[in-house]
Amino acid sequence: MAKILVLYYSMYGHIETMAHAVADGANRVDGVEVVVKRVPETMQAEAFAKAGGKTQNAPVATPQELAEYDAIIFGTPTRFGNMSGQMRTFLDQTGGLWASGALYGKIASVFSSTGTGGGQEQTITSTWTTLAHHGMIIVPIGYGAQELFDISQVRGGTPYGATTIAGGDGSRQPSEEELAIARYQGEHVAKLAVKVHG
């Protein structure tokens, strides 16, 4: 049984929605156990609420537990072409895992969101840098999801990983096409996890 963690940070709920779609896709594959968790919030509660942050019910992960999984699919919003500070803070606490090689050979993949589309690919590839230092097997999605070929509407989605475009004010929710790409990413990673670790 391959254990898969979908680990995310989401302030306004877009990445949370994508995380559940990724998990749904992974659950399509036999021989996997899928867990969805989030990284801790680093903002003060009052500031988070004032900024319009959305309360989320997913349990909070600890850096140490990452070693328990065969594959980890990371979800983070874009902050100026980089992962969110909350995800960065979480990953910066994995030095002990790096020193022991605990994540070496585990599968990793990344999905993201942006306000207007700028930086979504950079966020994914810059996150890969941290994962590469851990020796993780980085899995992009290529053009395996047919939705990536549809140019009839504004949407996220890249060969690097699933993305969504939230709009400058955050009012746009993930589209069905974006969620389909996220489900594809989860299924793709799960199939590989079963082959490698199952």
UniProtKB/Swiss-Prot annotation:
Binds 1 FMN per monomer. Keywords: Flavoprotein, FMN, NAD, NADP, Nucleotide-binding, Oxidoreductase. One of its GO terms (cellular component) is membrane. NAD(+) binds at Y12. The keyword Oxidoreductase applies. Its cofactor is FMN. Its EC number is 1.6.5.2. InterPro entries: Flavodoxin/NO_synth, Flavoprotein-like_sf, Flavoprotein_WrbA-like, FMN_Rdtase-like_dom, NQO. GO terms for molecular function: flavin adenine dinucleotide binding; FMN binding; NAD binding; NADH:ubiquinone reductase (non-electrogenic) activity; NADP binding; NADPH dehydrogenase (quinone) activity. It comes from the Bacteria. Residues 4-189 form the Flavodoxin-like domain. The keyword Flavoprotein applies. Substrate binds at W98. It catalyses: a quinone + NADH + H(+) = a quinol + NAD(+); a quinone + NADPH + H(+) = a quinol + NADP(+). FMN binds at residues 10-15, 78-80, 113-118, 133. HAMAP family: NQOR. Belongs to the WrbA family. This is NAD(P)H dehydrogenase (quinone). It comes from Klebsiella pneumoniae (strain 342).
